[in-house]
Amino acid sequence: MYDKQDKQAVAIIGSGNIGTDLMIKVLRDAKHLEMGAMVGIDPASDGLARAKRLGVATTAHGIEGLVTMPNFGAIRIAFDATSAGAHHRHAAVLREHGVTVIDLTPAAIGPFVVPVVNLFAHLDAPNLNMVTCGGQATIPIVHAVSRVAPVRYAEIVASIASRSAGPGTRANIDEFTETTSKAIETVGGAARGKAIIVLNPAEPPLMMRDTVYCLTEEEADTDEIESSIRAMVSAVASYVPGYRLKQAVQFDRYTAANPLALHANERRAGLKVSVFLEVEGAAHYLPSYAGNLDIMTSAALAAAEQIAASRVAA
């Protein structure tokens, strides 16, 4: 058990689906965090109404409303679940007040963070970017391969239910691909990365599916790669219980005589690793098919919990 004084107060900026799901996770599961404020701009939003019913302090006046709340001085960590454009302004205001920011938008002001890969390197960063839903699902796999064999090229395809993609996701499609591609390289360890997102209109909606392709050396050890991948899947599932391999890891060897076509004008020999994932949401607030949103809120919560725990330990 943890005493109340061991917990750090958090604010959630953005009272939409992601912000509301994150609030419920903090209230249900957090050991080192407590809700300090839910911040929105729509007084009629379900997220603000739900927060009030749960006894959480609220404001419908955005970042300006947050800094004038009586308990703002107690806020140590803020989650931004708005948009990349809005985050730049929010980050500047919160930085002035010494509040650590966990950014769930593609703004990428701070370092990219995937909890199982590089969180401990950034515990003291003032602003941490959680990449994207596709990044949180696939970068651990790229890293799992790259830690045992060099990854020359990695490509990920994130397929999400169209119904789970709100206006923020749709408005940030370009940022999604750019941010995820960059993080595949800088966090995942691939020499080159590419990201594709697919909005699946199927009804009933399908769960999030992710495909990861990695090209490594032709002589790479398949047993070592598969063992590393399975260990990584278990690590991610420790904070995203619905994260799992959909089928066995697949390997295809391409020789100089029969190279793999990466692009129209590029062919390479090597070992192609194909990993197929499924992410089922916890259905705390969002439907279970919205694993793309659940993995973001779960990763953000895991990051904040570790940051808060490190402060308590200090």
Swiss-Prot record:
Keywords: Aromatic hydrocarbons catabolism, NAD, Oxidoreductase. The keyword Repressor does not apply. It comes from the Bacteria. Pfam families: AcetDehyd-dimer, Semialdhyde_dh. It comes from Paraburkholderia phytofirmans (strain DSM 17436 / LMG 22146 / PsJN). GO terms for biological process: catabolic process. The keyword Protein biosynthesis does not apply. Belongs to the acetaldehyde dehydrogenase family. The active site is at 133 (acyl-thioester intermediate). Its EC number is 1.2.1.10. NAD(+) binds at residues 15-18, 164-172, 292. This is Acetaldehyde dehydrogenase. GO terms for molecular function: acetaldehyde dehydrogenase (acetylating) activity; NAD binding. It is an enzyme of class 1 (oxidoreductase). It catalyses: acetaldehyde + NAD(+) + CoA = acetyl-CoA + NADH + H(+). InterPro entries: Acetaldehyde_dehydrogenase, Acetylaldehyde_DH_C, NAD(P)-bd_dom_sf, Semialdehyde_DH_NAD-bd.
